[in-house]
Amino acid sequence: DMAHIAGLVAGGVHPSPVPHADVTTFTTHKTLRGPRGGAVVAELDVIKKVNSALFPGGQGGPLMHVIAAKAIAFKEALAPEFSEYARAVVENAKALADRLQERGLRIVSGGTDNHVMLVDVGSKGLSGRDAEDALHAVDLTCNKNLIPYDERPPMEASGVRLGSAAITTRGLGTRECAQIADWISDIIEAPTDESVASRVKGEVAECAAAFPIYEASEVGGA
């Protein structure tokens, strides 16, 4: 399964498992940036068995609009610009991880070679859930996650997971990712300090405004 890394494989910045696996599955969202869904890749004799197993017992009618959206996503992934995007995703993730480590946070695995990283916040006296809540309060999205040999239960956890795909799509670069790492570190170091939270939330809002999801003209603005 290459659900998380399909876009990086398509962009040529991560090795492909397809030549080595009998069956490969992946999502069409995440780094591939298509609609929510999935796909199965295999040799014809195997894919016939997959299709027979799925339909009609486990799959309903096809959603043609989603199939069309997947086709567009695949077409975009063939463009040279998509390879540039994939490279930027990895560069941004490395910049984020490097700066977090400079600020004293441990990255499980010592860094990242793709778009995600797992940050150990338990070493700072926080649970993953508390860190998640504190970061969400200043509009920094993440999710709690267990770390290896975690002594906390899953709903508490000792880590948070971060990724660079969405912010790269918005146009943020390595400089902004280093700044995001500073904001995260500031919050982790002082999760209950309202003055720190207020400052960080304001700076996050300014950054988000500088990299809008849509141009004003695309949503009926001036």
Per-segment meaning from a language model:
Residues 61-64, 81-88, 100, 104-111, ...:
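Flexible, glycine/charged-enriched surface loops at secondary-structure junctions
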Residues 71, 88-94, 110-120, 151-153, ...:
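A glycine-rich phosphate-binding loop feature that marks nucleotide/adenosyl-phosphate handling sites
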Residues 106-171:
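Conserved PLP-binding catalytic core of the aspartate aminotransferase-like
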Residues 47-52, 71-77, 110-117, 157-164, ...:
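Short acidic (Asp/Glu) and glycine-rich catalytic loops that position anionic groups and cofactors
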Residues 2-104:
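Conserved PLP-enzyme active-site core in the AAT-like
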Residues 1, 24, 38-39, 70, ...:
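Buried hydrophobic positions in well-ordered alpha/beta secondary-structure cores of metabolic enzymes
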Residues 91, 154-222:
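PLP-dependent enzyme catalytic core of the Aspartate aminotransferase-like
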